[in-house]
Structures are given as C-alpha cells and as structure tokens.
UniProtKB/Swiss-Prot annotation:
Its EC number is 2.3.2.6. It comes from Shewanella amazonensis (strain ATCC BAA-1098 / SB2B). Functions in the N-end rule pathway of protein degradation where it conjugates Leu, Phe and, less efficiently, Met from aminoacyl-tRNAs to the N-termini of proteins containing an N-terminal arginine or lysine. It holds the Pfam family Leu_Phe_trans. Keywords: Acyltransferase, Cytoplasm, Transferase. This is Leucyl/phenylalanyl-tRNA--protein transferase. The gene is aat.
Length: 236
C-alpha cells in the first residue's frame, strides 16, 4: 500500500521508491536531514530531496522519470552558432560553490528558490567528499553558466543548471554529456521532465525502468581521474 513515510534524524534507509504517492507524483517521505550518508542512500535508491524553504524536507521518486541516454543529447543550431561566435571556456569542478549560487538565483516570475542555504551547505559537503560535481561555462574570466549534480557509479544525477548568457547552460549540458560518454557513463538522471529538457533530448521512462537501470550501473567503478578539476574540450 502506497503512503507517505515519516523519517527521523537517525534513520538513513528509505522505504521502497515504488511506495511513493501518485499525487503529488513521487512524494515518498518527509523529514530527516541532509546528512551526506542520507543523501547518498537516497540517490543510490533513486530518491532526491526537493522542498521549499518553509517546508520540511521532502523526498521524491516520481513516475515517470526524465533521463538522458548516451548519445541522445540534441545540440541546437543556436548552440552550434554560439560555439563559433563566442570565446567560451568550460571547466569541471573549478567553482562548485559559485555554480550552486548561480542555480539558486530565483528564475523569472519566481519569488524564491528551492536551492536553500541548507541545500547549498549539504551539497558543498558532498562536493568536498567527492560525490557532487559541477561544470562551469566561462566567457573570459566571468562565470556565465553551469550545472551541478551527483555521480553514483556510472549514473550522473543532474540537479540544476543556470545561465547568464544565452546558450551557456546548453553548453554546460553538452560538455557534461561528452564527458560522461568518454567515461562510459550509462545514464544521466534529469528527474522531472520540462520543455527545456525535452528540447535537449531527454526522454521519460517509467520509475520501474529507471530503477532497473540505476541498480544495474550504480556500483560500476569509475576512474579516479574522471572528476579531477580540469578544462574541458568543447566539441564543435
């Protein structure tokens, strides 16, 4: 029987994602904290936190799930033109905190953000432990876009992206996609579909299918060099 579970500060493991509510879609549990062990346990099981500043911590595993499969990213004509026109530079793990701060800025027509100070501190700790990673897009020395997420084996769980220049977030996604292909990643989790993700080539799969892929690849080893800070080549 599906139902909302309440977790306390000591509880690390989560109920099965298949028990998540259908309305609101994917809500599985409430409570707990954003301790690194709990966050790792959540992503390992296909669960992620998503809540507003005034809410308790809410944990989700929606059905269907938005994902990118290897080789399915769509590169728009505008991005191809931008690659030729602008002196972009892309790095990995050079400015994680700045990328999170950029993602935390409220979007147009939004009063606030779900990327609260609590979220930022939790993922900064995950970054310091080597679990969370960022891609940065620069125009000369100015950060103009980027994204961040977590790596669980050969699955990358994307969290958020931002841009201050047209196409900068698309370039961050393209660079990440190329990087994941080079290191034989099998899945890029995008969580919940939206028009922007769909335009980039994301597809929806059932929660059951997503969890099957996650279980297959979450324990696959990745070279330590994969996430070393570096400048990333830009495929044109």
């Amino acid at each position: 029987m599906n139902g909302l579970s309440f977790i306390d500060d000591e509880q690390i493991r989560f109920p099965s994602p298949e028990l998540a509510l259908s309305e609101p879609n994917g809500l599985l549990a409430i409570g707990g904290s954003l301790h690194p062990k709990r966050l790792l346990a959540a992503y390992y099981d296909g669960i992620f936190p998503w809540f507003n500043a005034e809410d308790p911590i809410l944990w989700w595993s929606p059905d269907p799930r938005a994902v990118f499969l290897p080789g399915e990213l769509k590169i728009s004509r505008s991005l191809k033109k931008s690659l030729k026109k602008h002196p972009w530079r892309v790095t990995i793990n050079h400015a994680f905190a700045d990328v999170m701060a950029g993602c935390a800025q409220p979007r147009k027509k939004q009063r606030d953000t779900w990327i609260t100070q609590e979220i930022q501190l939790a993922y900064l700790e995950m970054h310091s432990q080597g679990h969370a990673h960022s891609v940065e897009v620069w125009m000369k020395d100015r950060l103009v876009g980027g994204l961040y997420g977590l790596a669980i084996g050969k699955v990358f769980c994307g969290e958020s992206m931002f841009h201050r220049e047209t196409d900068a977030s698309k370039l961050a996604m393209m660079a990440l996609h190329q990087h994941l292909l080079q290191h034989d990643f099998k899945l890029l989790d995008a969580q919940i579909m939206n028009p922007h993700l769909e335009s980039l080539g994301a597809r929806e799969v059932s929660r059951t299918a997503f969890l099957s892929l996650l279980k297959r690849y979450r324990d696959e080893p990745v070279a330590k060099s994969c996430w070393l800070p570096r400048e990333m080549p830009i495929g044109k």
